[in-house]
């Protein structure tokens, strides 16, 4: 490497690090907004977030950034850069080209709107009043449609949004794999509804104090390899994980004293996200590569933890006595087998994050269909509540009674995250495929859970997935780890085997 090459690379890395530092400050502000910032400070905080986001936007689309990218791309051709820097240039170029097409004033207005919209959504959800939130959502959708015209699209406008969260995934791919999954899930849901087996679920809805739930979930987090030296657990309306840096990865949860599953499984889910972020390779710190490679791969890790670990019978053989010690005595007459069946009960429900493993993908499909229709122009925002309710009835056979139970339950649209929801189902499919491959290397998977030893499992995930951050694309990771492309049958096989055993079908 020549002195000139070294200098331009060094200057570029310093410039990018400044952008990442602004991003860390923004993450801290978003975390604060959603974990208890005073209501009267929301408008000013939104102003600050808008200003800092605008600064990041300006830096990422500046002539200086453009010059760095052009110069470094010529060095890539001459093979004079490290692999990590090459990947960073590719990542920054993608963001540069995307953001350069959006006028700065429009971007700043959008970010301010988004910050305010999340607070309005929260209040609208509490009051179950979609009309309160509708004007904000209409503006967000309007902005997104305008942005798509700037970015361009292939075949479907929605494909552009999907690519932001899951490169390589399109409407055509999703229609195919969702169709495959639906063909096998829907008949199984019907079989279960006709099953005579009754699960003992009463204990799940008995009083379980918030403080005891918190202490129990803290114990589980330690067992699951969540590093409290590099994170913390807080309370919020809608659980999430947020990364400030790989040494500060925070998770939040929500407690319901009449249903402990919300906190326990929600926390395990967010733990999967956090463990991913905490175990990205250290040398990627301070670069745009120091995070999960896509939303789908990220969800594969959270769902792997929540379902393949947290809803596994062996996990509860280890932790059931611990649960009993923390609870208020409601599980004293319930065996671990009965408890396992109960927490895996399958029946249609209104709330996505409370859905069981089997019906969960159907919740995602509802949102996917609505988003497609919003962006192909066949559905208007004002008609969302009715359209939501109709699709819930079609897919799950139930109809929400109010907006909080229906269209207002998720924060994603308030944050402009259209194209994100399919990642949940993709993540589920990825996770099942990873688990199938992992068993070849760790055939004693269940025995490890029964011992409370999650470390070998976490280490396998780190070695094969976590450490790479964004240096590998999602479908590249899937192919490298499993030796094949996306295959929905692994998830369908897992669900059929599990639920036929539980319901004795």
Name the predicted role of every residue range.
Residues 2-167, 496-503:
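A well-structured
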Residues 12, 152, 269, 302, ...:
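Divalent metal-coordination and catalytic microenvironments
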Residues 262-281, 299-303:
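Active-site recognition of the HExxH zinc-binding catalytic motif
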């Amino acid at each position: 490497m020549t002195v000139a090459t070294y200098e331009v690379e060094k200057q570029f890395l310093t410039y990018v690090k400044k952008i990442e530092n602004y991003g860390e400050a923004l993450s801290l502000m978003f975390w604060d907004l959603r974990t208890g910032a005073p209501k009267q400070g929301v408008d000013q905080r939104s102003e600050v977030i808008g200003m800092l986001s605008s600064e990041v936007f300006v830096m990422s689309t500046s002539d200086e950034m453009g010059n760095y990218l052009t110069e470094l791309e010529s060095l890539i051709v001459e093979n004079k850069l490290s692999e990590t820097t090459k990947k960073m240039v590719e990542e920054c170029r993608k963001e540069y080209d995307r953001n350069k097409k959006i006028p700065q004033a429009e971007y700043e207005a959008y970010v301010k709107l988004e910050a305010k919209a999340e607070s309005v959504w929260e209040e609208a959800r509490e009051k179950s009043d979609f009309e309160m939130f509708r004007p904000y959502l209409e503006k967000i959708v309007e902005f997104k449609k305008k942005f798509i015209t700037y970015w361009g699209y292939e075949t479907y406008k929605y494909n552009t949004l999907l690519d932001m969260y899951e490169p390589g995934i399109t409407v055509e791919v999703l229609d195919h794999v969702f169709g495959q999954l639906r063909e096998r899930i829907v008949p199984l849901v019907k079989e279960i509804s006709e099953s005579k087996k009754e699960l003992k679920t009463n204990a799940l809805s008995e009083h379980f104090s918030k403080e005891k739930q918190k202490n129990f979930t803290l114990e589980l987090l330690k067992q699951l390899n969540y590093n409290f030296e590099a994170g913390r657990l807080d309370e919020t309306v809608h659980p999430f994980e947020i990364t400030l840096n790989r040494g500060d990865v925070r998770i939040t949860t929500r407690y319901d004293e009449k249903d402990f599953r919300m906190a326990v499984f929600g926390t395990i889910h967010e733990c999967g996200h956090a463990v991913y972020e905490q175990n990205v390779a250290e040398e990627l710190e301070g670069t745009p590569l120091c995070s999960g490679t896509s939303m789908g791969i990220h969800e594969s890790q959270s769902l792997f933890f929540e379902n393949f670990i947290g809803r596994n019978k062996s996990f509860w053989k280890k932790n059931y006595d611990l649960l009993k010690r923390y609870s208020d005595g409601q599980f004293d007459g319930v065996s671990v087998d009965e408890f396992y069946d109960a927490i895996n009960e399958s029946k249609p429900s209104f709330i996505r994050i409370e859905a069981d493993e089997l019906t969960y993908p159907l919740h995602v499909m509802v949102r996917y269909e609505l988003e497609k229709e919003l962006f192909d122009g066949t559905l208007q925002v004002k008609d969302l509540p009715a359209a939501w309710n109709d699709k819930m009835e079609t897919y799950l056979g139930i109809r929400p009674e109010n907006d909080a139970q229906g269209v207002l339950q998720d924060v994603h649209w308030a944050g402009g995250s259209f194209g994100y929801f399919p990642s949940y189902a993709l993540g589920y499919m990825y996770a099942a495929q990873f688990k199938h491959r992992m068993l070849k290397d760790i055939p004693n998977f269940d025995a490890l859970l029964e011992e409370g030893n999650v470390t070998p499992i976490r280490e396998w995930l780190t070695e094969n997935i976590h450490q790479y951050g964004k240096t590998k694309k999602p479908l590249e990771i899937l192919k490298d780890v499993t030796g094949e492309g996306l295959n929905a049958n692994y998830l369908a096989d897992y669900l059929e085997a599990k639920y036929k055993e539980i319901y004795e079908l």
